[in-house]
Amino acid sequence: VVADKRGHLAVTDTRGNAVLLYELSPTPRQIGRVELPGTPYGIAYDPVRDRLWVTLTALNEVIGLNLNANTPVLATPLPTVRQPNTVAVDSATGRLFVTGTDEGVLEIIEP
């Protein structure tokens, strides 16, 4: 679960192959669903670029969702380590850090 700069929450639905978007105020409610085949799992948010990053474990990819429009826009998926489980983003540089199931492997993806 991550929060964006608008105070919305993004949650991965691994079994449903989607990212779910929620508004919290005045009461919590789902405001969006983005279908992502490939078992979305890890999630990170870059507030500078207003981009959500999601790992797709079944495809060995990470994909960005641009959130600066009314409807999230998918970026081109990027290949990653085997079964990427976690992702982090350095908002100063846009650099991504991805780890998977291989012991000791950290992939760094430059913007």
PLM feature spans:
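Predominantly soluble domains enriched in secretory-pathway, periplasmic, or organellar proteins
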Residues: 1-111
